[in-house]
UniProtKB/Swiss-Prot annotation:
Keywords: Cell membrane, Flavoprotein, FMN, Membrane, Oxidoreductase, Pyrimidine biosynthesis. This is Dihydroorotate dehydrogenase (quinone). Monomer. The active site is at residue 183. The gene is pyrD. FMN binds at residues 68-72, 92, 147, 180, 214, 242, 267, 296, 317-318. It is an enzyme of class 1 (oxidoreductase). InterPro entries: Aldolase_TIM, DHO_dehydrogenase, Dihydroorotate_DH_1_2, Dihydroorotate_DH_2, Dihydroorotate_DH_cat, Dihydroorotate_DH_CS. It comes from the Bacteria.
Amino acid sequence: MIFERVVRPRLFRLGNGDAETAHEFTVRRLAGLARVPAALAVLRARYGVSAPRTVFGLRFPNPVGLAAGMDKNGVALPAWPALGFGFVEVGTVTAHPQPGNPRPRLFRLPDSRAVVNRMGFNNAGAGALAARLAALPRPLGVPLGISLGKSKVTPLEEAVEDYQASYQALRGYGDYFAVNVSSPNTPGLRALQDRAHLDALLAALVGEKPVLVKIAPDLPDSAIAELLEVCLARGAAGVIATNTTLARDGLAPADQAGGAEAGGLSGRPLAQRAREVVSFVHTETGGRLPVVGVGGILTPDDAERMFDAGASLVQLYTGFIYRGPALVRAAAAAARTP
């Protein structure tokens, strides 16, 4: 309640309401806290929840994780487990450093509890992330996922080599890797969800560490089924469902102007479709392919419904923006019984 009544209004006023300014401020502050062990201990005592489960060979202290995009460069890593997250996914990171799309590129739709982003994989590059992870003073204590994307300067026909370069730089640090082939903000990226492209990509990456595929909610079920065939045939460890959507269904009237911004939509309007995709993946694969459910989780009930749809784990991004760490704790507590 303190977050929603006091902290969030102040964050939302930063930079004259610019969402990315608030995001950067939050990550900087958490990076500062991450260097203070006593502060981390206080946060852990308040927000930590034990609800362990093992998925794709990894033990998770609880099944509620931080989605990619919140801490792209891993600058605040020790803070996220202290806020209750049972795993953390950094990135999306690319082989080449890149600035992303021009600002403004992140927009809040508060009445809809949603966000539109067209960030464009802004990140410092795989090499910089590897150096930061190598310098961590102690183990994170939760599984670390690393989301990999294609560099904008890399042509589609060289995508496999681009992903491989990032993987090779980071394979010693990630507990699992997420292949992001579904962001709507990198031209041509979603073509990598096609059978031939995805088959070549997974053939190059699957092996040493668990590799998951992050899919778009805008794919028809027939295309998802084809993608799942490739994942099973190539030994992918799981699927992350879903990325942001290009659809604009379910927006509140006051958010129509913000919703007209180009980019991917996340948050409450995505919840139903994300659950549908999770359920489809779980049913289509007979539970053989673990699913990480992400999209529209803003309450503990939303998390429970995602688990009921077939998710083994869930991730938060937009829900964390609007509800803060109390949502992490409540969602993890609701998941104590798998």
